[in-house]
Amino acid sequence: REKATVFTAPLPADAAELAFWAKFGFAAEGRQLVRRRTPDLTAVKFVQDFLAARLAQPRLCIDATCGNGGDTAFLCGITAPEGKVVGFDVQEAAIASTRKHLEQLGVPAARYELHCQSHADLLQIVQPGTADAVMFNFGWLPGADHAVFSTAQSSIPALQAALEAVRPGGVVSAILYSGQVIGTDEKQTVLEYLRALPLKSFTVLVCDFANWAETAPLPCIILKK
């Protein structure tokens, strides 16, 4: 369970003011008002929870979009002790950020390898049918220039490579984004591609947050048969 965020405020002496704060979820604890808010389930957490439940001691996992290393670290955490995580990102800043994050967490260097190259080229590094899982978190590098983001032109070939790289029984996950900056082209193109995958070979789950905004991150999961 994710850790709750704690908000505090001075304890008012007036009952009316106390009632006002109660409308916003604050309650008296000792000499202060306290409100605890557990974070909403996020698309990233949803996908991570699914993979953790689905995979038992995977030996080879791929983070196809390293970003700041969150998914890379997650995969290192669920991979078997003798296993390995392979990460890809086209931005050197992302590779450096991921490496720093893993080092801060104390992940042994032998547990992972990072490649500053397109995820569409992952079959140059990974043999077909050998990966237990491949994770994609499309969009842009958090905290970096939003003018640099993934597009359908590279995402579709990367997904094709991932589906070839993963073993039967393995999983490919993809979180799709849309919005004012990146538009809807990648999201719609990827969805069309996923929905056209043959049922005899794949099961595709599109897991939208039905009461969130239309531009909310959209997790997709592909199970290879």
Model-identified regions with their sequence ranges:
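Conserved GNAT acetyl-CoA-binding A-motif
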Residues: 2-12
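S-adenosyl-L-methionine
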Residues: 20, 30, 34-59, 70, 95-132, ...
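Class I S-adenosyl-L-methionine
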Residues: 30-37, 183-225
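Conserved class I S-adenosyl-L-methionine
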Residues: 58-67, 86
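Conserved beta-strand signature within the Rossmann-like core of class I S-adenosyl-L-methionine
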Residues: 65, 168-176
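Conserved SAM/SAH-binding beta-strand->alpha-helix loop
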Residues: 91
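Mobile active-site "lid"/loop adjacent to the S-adenosyl-L-methionine
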Residues: 135-158
